[in-house]
């Protein structure tokens, strides 16, 4: 039975038992900052188990994609080296929320395994918690399993709890016995760590609530949470012991074999790569992008680990992204989002591969060099940190290399180096946090800025230089905290408001507004007079707020327009809303075409012209989702959210300030579209008068260009095309002249060739040529000389240009990049390229002649190595 059939069989079995088939949730847990990734089927039902959420069903069945890389549950360093560790796996699970309990859960599991899947009972082994006599009785007396294939285990193995307090309970586990040819004893025995008995299903019975004192109190409605790994079950059903031998992995391994032109499907690096493409693809499909923090950093680590293992197999060019296609072929039917996101996944992985490949070789050389000189077999923490900080080597990638060479890692030293860096970076980020900590003495601020731009208020706290003060004097800078304010605090991409606080005989200029918890911090400078705690003020927001409102409303229209033009997979990844402009970051695999940009811009302006009414409702996050409101990826929402609707065009959760009608935006103009990260595009745009000014400026430039080219605007494109075509013709003529010049110099250069053993060698400076001409001459010399190493140089506008060429029959001794590197270094520059052709540049012409003169000796030394 293949994996697709197993998924279908499992869902159908429990569907017939009145279970609601619930789609697996995202790998990114919703509203749960305690979890980095979804790591079990019960995660999406956590609030149901806790009693804070109700569902219209009491029985559920799901197939949940899960991650175990990063955080508490981290299998990354073992992946590829064992038969069953994976970064990504699928969890089959059935759940009861106060409906059936132990008897039915056990009966369903046993029936599915023995009657539906036809697994022989004599190959199964059952464990229960040592004090769970009810489950023991059900197994032995009702299911009548063989008592010799049954054991009791302690709390460590057979008692489950979500955290130190809360729902918990005993569990019963079902193991598959792979037979006596594999080492290991039954669960609960001293030999239980072997691989013979493999857990395939865990049934958790949540029947207690553990209080803060550790007491177990019975739950009013006991529940069931079960989990069974698809990969392990597939191994059992397909008669193999190693998960990498099942259909899912074999399909990917064979695709990788073709890609890398290798035959060893059991190679550890091959296994690492095919495991990692699954977790990487699903994470990107769920909206994660490579970065240097949080989930994005875990994704980056996994990609880089796969790339490094490809490098071990001799693959130095980007290859990992090409496994996306076979993965989609194998799993796209079960997970349509994977198929829908294929282009984004490929583009994101490829960009990350290219970026990392630039530093991988250098980092490996440094590590090789340092390891060769270490006095012990421990890699120092400062070296691990240097590789991480300078060359992007995640510590687990260095640990992989250490493991392969029988070295250990100095993690304590690495942690100290990391801590030093954190302390340095945190010093620059204490401003707002310190103010908020001091301001918390003063209470909270009521925000009234949705209804008005000015209000009366009382000063409840003043701060200066991180310290609470009672009085702020003229010309002094500080922070004012009010009991109520119309000033919007920086949040959700919208900048903080500016304006003034007016009071008797004085004023305070608010330059920025920030928020910490319920405290609004009005940051600025006293213009005149003095201000005391408990004084009354009139708070007035600057009229620039209207421009901010226009731009914020425009971002909502832009977001929806992008989804309609490019597809619903587009997700917001960030934004900046200020008075002068707006910036919007979104997930998309490639640059937008001019036609797509035009369609987006036109669609936004159509909604502005339609003058749609903006309405706001306050509701729970669950109600907002049912309404179809878009939520910002990764945002954690409170009990209530504001939902902004613009006609029937856009519905989003948003706490920002907006125009009452879309017509108030006036005009929308996209001024740039660019990439800001792998798989992330950025649009910058203007609205209102700023957009009109931009268009008028563009019109003026067109008029000036038309005058310059002596044509009207209607014929401007044709005129420019003709000029460019003439330019291309001239460039071709110039190239021919350069080629002719190269040919003319060829005979003279051949006469200056010296023989270093059997390698014809030339290292010389040429005058009045450019780099392209140097390349042409190198190519012709390689053809003429047979077995040759050539370095040509010229000085162009005060800067040295270098080109080196090596014929193929020299590559067993050295290549062009190796040949050119010391020369470039001597002239204060850098070089790079292919094995047969390298290029470089330098800044020290005075060292050039000596550097070229050293080439024959360098070659002679290489030949002796």
UniProtKB/Swiss-Prot annotation:
The cofactor named in the record is: Zn(2+)
Q: Where in the cell is it found?
A: Cytoplasm
Q: What is its EC number?
A: 6.1.1.7
Gene3D superfamilies xref list: 2.40.30.130, 3.10.310.40, 3.30.54.20, 6.10.250.550, Bira Bifunctional Protein, Domain 2, Threonyl-trna Synthetase, Chain A, domain 2
What PROSITE patterns has UniProt attached to this entry? AA_TRNA_LIGASE_II_ALA (PS50860)
Q: What does this protein do?
A: Catalyzes the attachment of alanine to tRNA(Ala) in a two-step reaction: alanine is first activated by ATP to form Ala-AMP and then transferred to the acceptor end of tRNA(Ala). Also edits incorrectly charged Ser-tRNA(Ala) and Gly-tRNA(Ala) via its editing domain.
HAMAP family xrefs: Ala_tRNA_synth_B
UniProt protein name: Alanine--tRNA ligase
Originating organism = Coxiella burnetii (strain RSA 493 / Nine Mile phase I)
């Amino acid at each position: 039975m293949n994996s697709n059939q197993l998924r279908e069989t499992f869902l159908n079995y429990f569907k017939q038992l009145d279970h609601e088939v619930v789609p697996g949730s995202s790998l990114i847990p919703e509203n749960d900052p305690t979890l980095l990734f979804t790591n079990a089927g019960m995660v999406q039902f956590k609030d149901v188990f806790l009693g804070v959420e109700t569902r219209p069903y009491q029985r559920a069945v799901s197939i949940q994609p899960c991650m175990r890389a990063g955080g508490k549950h981290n299998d990354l360093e073992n992946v590829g080296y064992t038969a069953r560790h994976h970064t990504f796996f699928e969890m089959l699970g059935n759940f009861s929320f106060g409906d059936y309990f132990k008897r039915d859960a056990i009966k369903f599991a046993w029936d599915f395994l023995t009657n539906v899947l036809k697994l022989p009972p004599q190959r199964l082994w059952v464990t229960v918690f040592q004090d769970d006599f009810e489950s023991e009785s059900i197994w032995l007396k009702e299911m009548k399993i063989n008592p010799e294939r049954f054991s009791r285990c302690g709390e460590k193995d057979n008692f489950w709890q979500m955290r130190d307090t809360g729902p918990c309970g005993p569990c019963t586990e079902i193991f598959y016995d792979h037979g006596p040819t594999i080492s290991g004893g039954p669960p609960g025995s001293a030999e239980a760590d072997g691989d013979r008995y493999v857990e395939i299903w865990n049934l958790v019975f949540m029947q207690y609530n553990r209080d803060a004192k550790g007491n177990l109190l019975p739950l009013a409605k006991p529940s069931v949470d079960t989990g069974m790994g698809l990969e392990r079950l597939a191994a059992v059903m397909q008669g193999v012991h190693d998960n990498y031998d099942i259909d899912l992995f074999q399909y990917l391994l064979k695709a990788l074999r073709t890609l890398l032109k290798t035959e060893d499907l059991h190679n550890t690096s091959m296994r690492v790569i095919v495991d990692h493409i699954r977790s990487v693809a699903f994470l990107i499909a769920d909206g994660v992008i490579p970065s240097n923090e949080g989930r994005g950093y875990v994704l980056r680590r996994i990609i880089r680990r796969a790339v490094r293992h490809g490098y071990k197999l001799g693959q130095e060019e980007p290859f990992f992204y090409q496994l996306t296609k076979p993965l989609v072929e194998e799993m796209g039917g079960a997970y349509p989002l994977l198929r829908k996101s294929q282009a984004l996944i490929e583009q994101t992985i490829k960009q990350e591969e290219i970026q990392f490949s630039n530093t991988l070789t250098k980092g490996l050389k440094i590590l090789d060099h340092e390891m060769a000189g270490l006095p012990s077999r421990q890699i120092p923490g400062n070296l691990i940190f240097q590789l991480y900080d300078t060359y992007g080597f995640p510590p687990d990638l260095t640990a992989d290399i250490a493991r392969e060479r029988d070295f250990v890692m100095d993690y304590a030293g690495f942690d100290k180096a990391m801590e030093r860096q954190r302390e340095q970076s945190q010093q620059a980020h204490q401003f707002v946090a310190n103010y908020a900590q001091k301001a918390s003495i003063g209470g909270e601020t009521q925000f009234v800025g949705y209804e008005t731009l000015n209000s009366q208020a009382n000063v409840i706290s003043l701060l200066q230089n991180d310290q609470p003060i009672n009085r702020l004097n003229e010309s002094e800078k500080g922070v004012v905290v009010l009991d109520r304010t119309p000033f919007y605090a920086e949040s959700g991409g919208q900048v903080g408001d500016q304006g003034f606080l007016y009071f008797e005989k004085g004023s305070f200029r608010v330059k920025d507004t920030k928020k910490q918890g319920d405290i609004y911090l009005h940051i600025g400078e006293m213009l005149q007079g003095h201000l005391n705690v408990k004084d009354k003020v009139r708070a007035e927001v600057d009229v620039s707020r209207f421009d901010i409102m226009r731009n914020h409303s425009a971002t909502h229209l832009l977001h929806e327009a992008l989804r309609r033009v490019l597809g619903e997979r587009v997700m917001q990844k960030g934004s900046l809303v200020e008075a002068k402009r707006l910036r919007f970051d979104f997930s998309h695999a490639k640059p937008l075409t001019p036609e797509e940009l035009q369609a987006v811009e036109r669609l936004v302006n159509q909604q502005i012209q339609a003058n749609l009414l903006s309405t706001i409702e306050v509701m729970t996050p669950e109600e907002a989702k049912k309404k179809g409101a878009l939520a910002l990826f990764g945002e954690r929402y409170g009990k209530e959210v504001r939902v902004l609707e613009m006609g029937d065009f856009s519905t989003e959760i948003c706490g920002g300030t907006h125009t009452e009608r879309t017509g108030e935006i006036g005009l929308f103009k996209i001024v740039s579209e660019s990439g800001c990260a792998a798989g992330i595009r950025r649009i910058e745009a203007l609205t209102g008068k700023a957009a009109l000014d931009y268009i008028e400026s563009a019109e003026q430039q067109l008029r000036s260009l038309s005058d310059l080219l002596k044509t009207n605007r209607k014929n401007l494109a044709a005129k420019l095309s003709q000029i460019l075509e003439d330019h291309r013709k001239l460039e071709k003529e110039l190239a021919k002249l350069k080629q002719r010049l190269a040919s003319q110099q060829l005979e003279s250069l051949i006469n200056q060739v010296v023989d270093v053993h059997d390698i014809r060698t030339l290292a010389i400076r040429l005058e009045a040529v450019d780099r392209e001409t140097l390349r042409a001459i190198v190519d012709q010399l390689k053809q003429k000389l047979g077995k040759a190493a050539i370095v040509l140089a010229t000085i162009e506008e005060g800067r040295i240009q270098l080109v080196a060429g090596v014929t193929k029959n020299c590559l067993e001794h050295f290549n062009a990049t190796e040949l050119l590197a010391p020369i470039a270094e001597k002239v204060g520059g850098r070089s790079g390229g292919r094995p047969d052709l390298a290029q470089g540049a330098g800044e020290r012409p005075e060292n050039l002649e000596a550097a070229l003169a050293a080439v024959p000796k360098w070659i002679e030394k290489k030949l002796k190595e």
